[in-house]
Amino acid sequence: MRVLARIPTVNRLRTVAQGLEYVPAKGPAIIAARHYHHLFDGLAFFAAVERRFHIVVTLDWAQSRRSKFLMSMLNRLARWPMVLREDALLSGATQRRTLFKPSDLPRYQLAALRQSVKLLGEKRLLIIFPEGYPNIDPIYTPKTGADEFLPFKPGFAVIAECAERVMHQAVPIIPTGIRYQTGSTWLAQLNFGPPVYRRDFPSRQQLIEHVAGAVKQLSAVQIKI
């Protein structure tokens, strides 16, 4: 996946990063990041993070059986957990809605949860975009502006809880901001923050709100080049 990711970035995207020391060189960890661009966000992580990682991705943007099959195959090879978004299916074209059944939603979510926990149990690095949607997406996004953030969904916190229960080990969650300078070549700026731990928060909701606030603050920071 890393090699394939380099192809579309030639002369289109440069990446700078700050706070990489917060990303552990080994051991289980979750990066909870802003989602701004449907393509460039993942490519920016490939450029900045040397360690192998796995991204929780959506499949509901597929518009044909061929694209669904191809992306499913690639994601399975890369061991990237796949989820579906119910609102994306309902808002999509009729052809896309026929690719998935209502019963697929819980099946995909449960499979993604199990795979994510398994990856963390293998001391892997997992990247999650808790907003669920980028600001820029040619298929569909509920966001209406470049500066808009959506409420964070609880998936990353649930994954951390389940993994910790299985491993009997704390999983660091690294809030990560993303911002871009546009032009003929886009400049991606990744800003990694200090890790937080589930044990430090009285409730899941407080953890989610803290991480969401940290990601928003980190995304506002202009990295000096």
Regions found by a protein language model. Give the residues of each.
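Generic preference for hydrophobic
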Residues: A17, I31, I55-V56, I173, ...
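Helix-to-loop junction immediately C-terminal to a conserved catalytic motif
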Residues: L4-Y36
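Residue-level detector of flexible, active-site-proximal loop/helix-junction positions
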Residues: Y22, A62, D87-L89, Y180-T182, ...
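Residue-level preference for short coil/turn positions at secondary-structure junctions
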Residues: A25-G27, R51, G121-E122, Q169
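Catalytic core of membrane glycerolipid acyltransferases/transacylases, capturing the structured
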Residues: K26-K101
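Non-catalytic C-terminal accessory region of glycerolipid acyltransferases
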Residues: R97-I225
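Structured helix-beta-strand junction loops
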Residues: N11, K26, L77, E122-K123
